[in-house]
Amino acid sequence: MSQKLYNMKFAAVYLALIAKVERKGGKAESVHQVTSWLTGYEVSDVLACLDRDVTYGDFFRQAPYYVPELIAITGKICGVRIEEIDDPLMQEIRRLDKLVDWLAKGKTSQQVLEKYEKHK
């Protein structure tokens, strides 16, 4: 399962995350902001990856940095606790999923980021 996700095109997965948030009344910009915050990419670099032939796994492997607050991003995604995932790459991917879930539940990107920045 992991390798299949890692090999998927970044654009396909990322656009699905955006669609999930937009279906619930959220905005694509919120997804861009939380992705940028988590991975260290500038928003413009995240958007540029949509037009490049980059895999989802490579997007995360090549992230400029991960914020220290990411360890505070815990909980379940697809029935699995993020903090119990052994594969560090999959952990980072699932952390973004968790942030996107908050956005899909009606939180703004500012509310989501403030929640985790309190753990500095």
Name the predicted role of every residue range.
Residues 1-120:
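A charge-rich, low-complexity, intrinsically flexible signal that marks solvent-exposed coils, linkers
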